Amino acid sequence: MNTAAIDQTDARPLDTTTAPMVDPFGRAVTYLRVSVTDRCDFRCTYCMAEHMAFLPKKDLLTLEELQRLCSAFIAKGVRKLRLTGGEPLVRKNIMFLIRELGKEIEAGRLDELTLTTNGSQLSKFAAELVDCGVRRINVSLDTLDPDKFRQITRWGELARVLEGIDAALAAGLKVKINAVALKDFNDAEIPELMRWAHGRGMDLTLIETMPMGEVDEDRTDHYLPLSEMRRRLEADFTLSDIPYRTGGPARYVEVAETGGRLGLITPLTHNFCESCNRVRLTCTGTLYMCLGQNDAADLRAALRATDDDAYLAQVIDEAIGRKPKGHDFIIDREHNRPAVARHMSVTGG
């Protein structure tokens, strides 16, 4: 990890009116993804090993520290903030952080606060999320088959997730379904999943499996290029490319037969690096400038070194200056190893 020292005597005060941070390749960094915990109540086979060793709780940033870091990024031009995990809603007292960050929207300093969830806790928190200023969420859901759902999550209950989605829609949240396309597992039911999502007014986004972290299965067995999935869908559906964007990497098509939108996230077959506008913060204060690279900055040390947010801003600037041009994702069929050693649950999915 690169933790180059920075002279605190050169610290400059934060300027909330400054332009967004710009990386060495001219990309404005306006989107922060924050993993508030590495813990999850599921153990999805492509995301985690079944017997994960979670981070000691003493290593995690407090919610107040996470709030301070998020505020520092907002002051430096971040306009969109997404909370992830693990499963963000299993973090104790997480609504404190969400409510505090919602105040940034009220003050006009943040355009959007959202989160990615597995849906298991939505029945409990959906209405409160809306009250805190959250307007849309992503729900990870790879199958509508209860047995397959239990198989891929290892112990999840599909009915609980579907109840959570119903609660979110009833509360007024805009819901997008994220599904990892897996060969010989859920590829045959993606048309059904798409019809179901579109019939309820939800977008569906398909994602190629990403080679991150050691898991208990061989990813190459289930890797499915979305170019192939699109060709299959076009046998039964009319897909038209549209310019719709949500600030993320998905490219969207409109499905004439359902009237809904289908997103495609293709980190391996068609990467999105040239327009990358985001960085990722872990629950331990590590900042990853790229999902598919290992270079990182230790913001926890800067956070705890001083109460001076100007020093923290300098450390952030130095990190953004190291944001790479692109990731190194590749499916390594020869050696059966991930391109990046850390799990997605640590980085933030």
Swiss-Prot record:
This entry's Gene Ontology molecular function terms read: 4 iron, 4 sulfur cluster binding; cyclic pyranopterin monophosphate synthase activity; GTP 3',8'-cyclase activity; GTP binding; metal ion binding; S-adenosyl-L-methionine binding
Q: Which cofactor(s) does the record list? A: [4Fe-4S] cluster
Q: Where does [4Fe-4S] cluster 2 bind?
A: C273, C276, C290
Q: How is the cofactor bound?
A: Binds 2 [4Fe-4S] clusters. Binds 1 [4Fe-4S] cluster coordinated with 3 cysteines and an exchangeable S-adenosyl-L-methionine and 1 [4Fe-4S] cluster coordinated with 3 cysteines and the GTP-derived substrate.
Say if the entry is tagged with keyword Nucleotide-binding. yes
Enumerate the UniProt keywords alphabetically: 4Fe-4S, GTP-binding, Iron, Iron-sulfur, Lyase, Metal-binding, Molybdenum cofactor biosynthesis, Nucleotide-binding, S-adenosyl-L-methionine
The record's listing under SMART domains reads: Elp3
State one Pfam family annotation: Fer4_12
Q: Which domain of life is it from?
A: Bacteria
Pathway(s) of this molecule: Cofactor biosynthesis; molybdopterin biosynthesis
Q: Which family does it belong to?
A: Belongs to the radical SAM superfamily. MoaA family.
Q: Which PANTHER family match?
A: MOLYBDENUM COFACTOR BIOSYNTHESIS PROTEIN 1 (PTHR22960:SF0), MOLYBDOPTERIN COFACTOR SYNTHESIS PROTEIN A (PTHR22960)
Can you name this protein? GTP 3',8-cyclase
